[in-house]
Design a protein with these regions (language model features):
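Conserved, structured core segments of small domains
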Residues: 1-139
């Protein structure tokens, strides 16, 4: 089994379609999908994000990081939320992604999350992280 992150991508035009949607309806729709993932035993994490205009961007392009309010540049590719699933293959992750609700016109990016065992085990910082994960029940 491997972990995959399903990244929900959108843009201003797509987000505008959902501005007037009933919030309770949205919660029910997303909650139903989340229930399916939980019943299948594949859901490890899921979070939606606040509007990009309420966030900040830290730009490391110069000598000193620059903090800018709101979305960075064009909002042609907003990151609206994510799922982390533990499934047998990227193909299975793709099948789950195809079922994500409320994605009309949007995109889902799927990326594998490497496990800690895939990193050099003799590295001091990997050892510290492994100990932290064991201590916090995240391993």
């Amino acid at each position: 089994m491997a972990k995959y992150m399903l990244i929900m991508r959108s843009n201003d035009e797509i987000n505008a379609k959902f501005e007037n949607i009933d919030f309770a309806e949205m919660l029910d729709t997303m909650g139903s999908f989340n229930d399916e993932l939980m019943r299948a035993g594949v859901l490890r994490a899921a979070e939606g994000l606040e509007d990009a205009k309420d966030g900040v961007v830290v730009d490391f392009g110069g000598e000193i990081p620059v903090v800018t309010p709101g979305p960075y540049g064009e909002t042609a590719a907003l990151f609206n939320g994510f799922y982390i699933l533990e499934v047998a293959s990227i193909d299975e992750a793709v099948e789950w992604a195809k079922r994500m609700p409320m994605m009309q016109g949007a995109k889902a990016e799927i990326r594998r999350v490497p496990g800690i065992d895939e990193f050099p085990q003799d590295n001091e910082f990997i050892q510290r992280e492994r100990e932290w994960r064991e201590r916090t029940g995240q391993l």
